Regions:
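Auxiliary alpha/beta "docking" domains used to position bulky ligands
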Residues: 1-187
Length: 188
């Protein structure tokens, strides 16, 4: 088995494949997230959000998805786009959430697949987790130093905001994790 690709190589591959940010987190259990999800679920504070609260033990422990996992390579893909022009015909128009206008997870997957391929080519295992409740993406992104938790509970990426979809490559390649970013929020 070769040495794992360098962090700078991983970031370069991700960014050249369309990702907007790439960071590394360790594969430890997200203990505080597990406690928060379990507490909210037991108090009925999940408002029927079964996707998020279905299996907190699984979604906060990367090693349940990949037992030999040592590192998470977390990617973010922006879905921000400028406002569309308003209809000039006077016809009714609708509003659709930005993230629902196209398959942004598909673009995220392309970037993460390019990273996974590089790892596999070097002899390492890689598993991609995107939008399937197998991992709490926001906590992975926070731990990977991609952004911080904003007052809206979303991950805020410096100078970019919260208009991102998130996903991870789990791997048995060991990397030094990035440090989480300090809270950059003001008093909005």
């Amino acid at each position: 088995m070769k040495s794992p690709p360098s962090l700078s190589r991983i970031q370069k591959i991700g960014m050249s494949s369309g990702l907007d940010s790439v960071g590394i987190a360790n594969a430890e259990i997200f203990k505080s997230t597990l406690q928060d999800l379990t507490k909210r679920k037991s108090k009925g504070l999940h408002a029927g959000m079964s996707f998020t609260y279905r299996n907190p033990e699984r979604s906060t422990n990367p090693k349940l998805a990949m037992p030999e996992c040592k590192s998470l390579i977390v990617g973010a893909k922006s879905y921000w786009e400028p406002s569309l022009e308003k209809s000039k015909t006077g016809s009714p128009t609708g509003r659709v959430a930005l993230y629902a206008r196209q398959d942004h997870y598909g673009a995220l997957r392309v970037g993460l697949e390019s990273i996974a391929e590089e790892l596999v080519d070097a002899g390492y295992d890689a598993r991609i987790l995107i939008d399937d409740n197998a991992l709490v993406d926001r906590e992975a992104a926070y731990r990977a130093g991609i952004g911080w938790y904003g007052k809206n509970s979303n991950i805020l990426i410096p100078k970019r905001g919260s208009w991102f979809v998130l996903g991870s490559v789990l791997t048995n390649a060991g990397y030094q994790p990035n440090k989480p970013l300090k809270d950059g929020c003001g008093s909005c």
